[in-house]
Amino acid sequence: MIRALIVAGLVAGLGCAQEAPPVATFSVSGDLTSPLVLKADDLAKMPRQTVSVLEHDGSKVEYEGVLLWEILKRAGTPADKQLRGKAMASYLLAKAHDGYQVVFTLAEMSPEFGNETIILADKRGGQPLSGNQGPLKLVVPGDKAGARSVRMVEAIEFVKLLK
């Protein structure tokens, strides 16, 4: 009887186990010359940028992180004079821990075209992102709606539509 209660208690405890929180790693994969996996330490060593955004409630919040364009260039996405012709027919698929996905074009981030500031943030208001916001978040301050700001982001896949 005691053994049955112990086993029942252990099994019940397993039902309460929660999924482990996301780890602060970010990968850039796809048809690239130098696919990357960046950890929190790697991101901390890269040049930082701060952006201000309006939250849903109208409050202004600052996010800090690394310019996504710089990460993409390190991974070997077409940039500068390479971003022409067939390279323009490509996209970036951002993937979050919870399955959420968003598409970006490479040209919208390029300084030669859209020059849109998008950062891979690890801090909000000077504090590390946590809970359902982090540990990493793509922040798109120029968007009127926040649907392309991807919380719990883990990866970007570079996809060429024309080879």
Predicted regions and their residues:
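Serine/threonine-rich low-complexity intrinsically disordered regions
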Residues: 1-3, 31
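Bacterial N-terminal signal peptides
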Residues: 3-13
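N-terminal intrinsically disordered, low-complexity segments enriched in P/E/S/T
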Residues: 16-163
